[in-house]
Amino acid sequence: MASSLNRMGPSVNKCIIYIDHLPVKTFYLATVEGDQPHVRPFGAVCEFEGKLYIVTNNKKDVYNQMKVNGKVEMCGMNKGTWIRVKGAVKEDTRREARVAMMEANKNALQSMYTVDDNLMTVFVFESGIATIYSFTEEPKVINL
């Protein structure tokens, strides 16, 4: 994975590659509701138009939390390294964005969503920073 990260050009691709190489492709997304943080597992990301995207169901609490306060953090771990992604997300209602997510994560998403089901919703990181940490190396910072 490290060699894949070093070869990649665009920043978002480095973040996607790291998440795609997580052992079970699970990362954790943190949101806030009032003064209470909420963390839950997620499993799909994609790059669309050079930006990092995540997906959820618009009937879930996480959807409402991100609509009210778009500041989120994600984290995942792989073989002694871990990634933290923090930033601001915004819902992208365009069908093309949902199609990109479905194409990038068909195996994970096709049993839950279709792009036109009025449930599948994608959020784009409008700004953010991903940092890959290790116990043995300096952190690698990726601007989103």
Short names for language-model regions:
Residues M1-F27:
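Extreme N-terminal tail/first-helix region
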Residues S4-R7, R84-L144:
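Charged, gly/pro-rich active-site loop segments
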Residues I19-G34, V72-M74:
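A short, Trp-centered hydrophobic/proline-enriched beta-strand micro-motif
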Residues Y28, L52-Y53, E73, R84, ...:
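General beta-strand recognition
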Residues Q36-P37, G80, Y133:
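Short glycine/serine/proline-enriched coil/turn segments at secondary-structure junctions
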Residues P41-G43:
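Conserved beta-strand in the GNAT
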Residues V45-G80:
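A short mixed-secondary-structure module that forms the rim of ligand-binding clefts
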